Swiss-Prot record:
GO terms classed as biological process: chromatin organization; foam cell differentiation; lipoprotein lipid oxidation; negative regulation of transcription by RNA polymerase II; negative regulation of transcription initiation-coupled chromatin remodeling; protein homooligomerization
Chief site of localization: nucleus
Organism expressing this protein natively: Mus musculus
Record's subunit section: Homopolymerize into a closed pentameric ring. Interacts (via SAM domain) with L3MBTL3 (via SAM domain); the interaction mediates L3MBTL3 binding to chromatin. Interacts (via WH domain) with KDM1A; the interaction modulates KDM1A function.
Basic and acidic residues compositional bias, start-end: 261-271
Compartments it resides in: Nucleus; Chromosome; Secreted
Region Disordered, annotated ranges: 1-30, 87-232, 261-381, 417-439
Molecular function terms, GO-annotated: chromatin binding; DNA binding; low-density lipoprotein particle binding
Induction remark: Expression is inhibited by miRNA MIR378C. Expression is induced by PDGF.
Occurrences of domain SAMD1-like winged helix (WH) (ranges): 23-99
Domain of life: Eukaryota
Ranges where the SAM domain occurs: 443-511
Protein name per its UniProtKB record: Sterile alpha motif domain-containing protein 1
Domain notes: Winged-helix (WH) domain directly recognizes and binds unmethylated CpG-containing DNA via simultaneous interactions with both the major and the minor groove of DNA.
Primary gene name: Samd1
């Protein structure tokens, strides 16, 4: 007859009880890995890792029931390997190792509990005491770094190990701030570096102040910088006038004043009929190539930087003519530096009364009519923007003998017809050549074709001929008509439209407000 079963020794029973308790309170390594991988996977897909999703995904991947997964998850939460987060009324779980570490000044995280063995728990004492005074402050963090991690939730350990090396080096060079938390010595150097760096930029910014120059003298434009628009009052003030105290300044008055100065010899006429300062009074020059590039780079009412001092050089003759004609026609006289006196003023070489000058509109050249540089009438200024630019693009001037078949007078906006001379031709133009009507309303289809050919659009001009567009039709064309009504590609059509509208706008604006285009 068998006796009662033998009881295990008391020591063995105690050890078994301790092991059972430890195994019940610690999560299984497999479950810990599965749960943490599931949380990371859900978060990488921007899915909220709540309890239901975690249990379902662990079951699908590895097979355990949701109850077991829930129990293992609770153990991981107790071990601080997983964090429970409540956000907007819903509870989700995060991998503690992937959560942002706490701020450096905050209290260090508690080291993970190690349930398996009592002897492995007391690592804070073996931490070697460093020589600096700041050792007590970092003792808990160093202890956390040296503590052996548990099988699963060892994540706080690496954070402490990352923080400890960052905080350890600073106390060696500076002993006084070592008593502060580790963040103190670490954050101190950047402000010091920042304090050393700011003085450098002010030294770099010191050179610009001596650069400003008086705008009326046109020094900035001569030096190659952007030209500042000049008002009529500045022009009159430079010439020694009253600055328009007697009434409103108009371009006609300023033009008359400039012509009087030219008659006195204070201003001189260039080869192309423009007014300029005597050569001895002009500021420094820019090279001819630079002036040509500057004149070409800006079009349509912008301030120009161009030079006329090199007009006597034969090799640059054609280039100078193009630049001067285009500048004289496109840019209002008030948009150029007054000191340089590069206002393309109407007139001829020699004294002439202001009333006679008002009547003259012809853009003829200096070789035959001495009037190439003549721009618009005093009250209208830049009325020949579009046509003169068109002539320039063809590489010649309106009445220069180099191109005998080029149509000379350039069309003007409606309502501003040129006053003919005694022989029926515009002033200054040589007779003997059939002239295109100066009023676009009177243009024929061939005049329109010729007009766009001179403007640099010979291929597109045929489209206007095919559609039989005369002057009246051209003036009535809208934007959509130019862009879609003709067999012209969009790019050239846009250029043609902008070219065309530029002239109309300037004509209307100057009729309403003579000073409307001043800078």
């Amino acid at each position: 007859m068998a006796g009662p079963p033998a009881l295990p020794p008391p020591e063995t029973a105690a050890a078994a009880t301790t092991a059972a308790a430890a195994s019940s309170s610690a999560a299984s390594p497999h479950y810990q890995e599965w749960i943490l991988d599931t949380i990371d996977s859900l978060r990488s897909r921007k899915a909220r890792p709540d309890l239901e999703r975690i249990c379902r995904m662990v079951r699908r991947r590895h097979g355990p029931e949701p109850e077991r997964t829930r129990a293992e998850l609770e153990k991981l939460i107790q071990q601080r390997a997983v964090l429970r987060v409540s956000y907007k009324g819903s509870i989700s779980y995060r991998n503690a190792a992937r959560v942002q570490p706490p701020r450096r000044g905050a209290t260090p995280p508690a080291p993970p509990r190690v349930p398996r063995g009592g002897p492995a728990a007391p690592p804070p004492t073996p931490a070697p005491p460093p020589a600096p005074v700041a050792a007590p402050t970092r003792a808990p963090r160093a202890a956390a770094a040296t503590a052996p991690p548990s099988p699963g939730p060892a994540q706080p350990g690496p954070r402490a190990q990352r923080a400890a090396p960052l905080a350890a080096p600073p106390p060696a060079p500076a002993a006084p701030p070592a008593a502060a938390p580790p963040a103190g010595p670490r954050r101190a150097p950047p402000p010091a570096v920042a304090a050393r760096e700011p003085p450098a930029p002010p030294q770099q910014q010191q050179p610009p102040p001596p650069q400003p120059q008086p705008p009326p003298e046109g020094g900035a434009a001569r030096a190659g910088g952007p030209a500042r628009p000049v008002s009529l009052r500045e022009v009159v003030r430079y010439l020694g006038g009253s600055g328009g105290a007697s009434g409103r300044l108009t371009r006609g008055r300023v033009q008359g004043l400039l012509e009087e100065e030219a008659a006195r010899g204070r201003l001189e006429r260039t080869r192309l009929g423009a007014l300029a300062l005597p050569r001895g009074d002009r500021p420094g020059r820019a090279p001819p190539a630079a002036s040509a590039r500057a004149a070409r780079s800006k079009r349509g009412g912008e301030e120009r930087v161009f030079e006329k001092e090199e007009e006597d050089e034969d090799e640059d003759e054609e280039e100078e003519e193009e630049d001067n004609v285009s500048e004289g026609s496109e840019v209002p006289e008030s948009d150029r530096p007054a000191g340089a006196q590069h206002h393309q003023i109407n007139g001829e070489r020699g004294p002439q009364s202001a009333k006679e000058r008002v009547k003259e509109w012809s853009p003829c050249g200096p070789y035959q009519g001495q009037d190439e540089g003549r721009g618009p009438a005093p009250g209208s200024c830049t009325r020949q923007v579009f046509p003169m630019t068109a002539v320039n693009k063809e590489g010649g001037s309106a009445c220069v003998g180099a191109a005998p078949d080029s149509p000379s007078p350039v069309p003007l906006p409606p309502g501003k017809p040129a006053l003919p001379g005694a022989d029926g031709t515009p002033f200054g133009c040589p007779p003997g050549r059939k002239e295109k009507p100066t009023d676009p309303v009177e243009w024929t289809v061939m005049d329109v074709v010729e007009y766009f050919t001179e403007a640099g659009f010979p291929e597109q001009a045929t489209a206007f001929q095919e559609q039989e567009i005369d002057g009246k039709s051209l003036l009535l064309m809208q934007r959509t008509d130019v862009l879609t009504g003709l067999s012209i590609r969009l790019g050239p059509a846009l250029k043609i439209y902008e070219h065309h509208i530029k002239v109309l706008q300037q004509g209307h604006f100057e009729d309403d407000d003579p000073d409307g285009l001043l800078g």
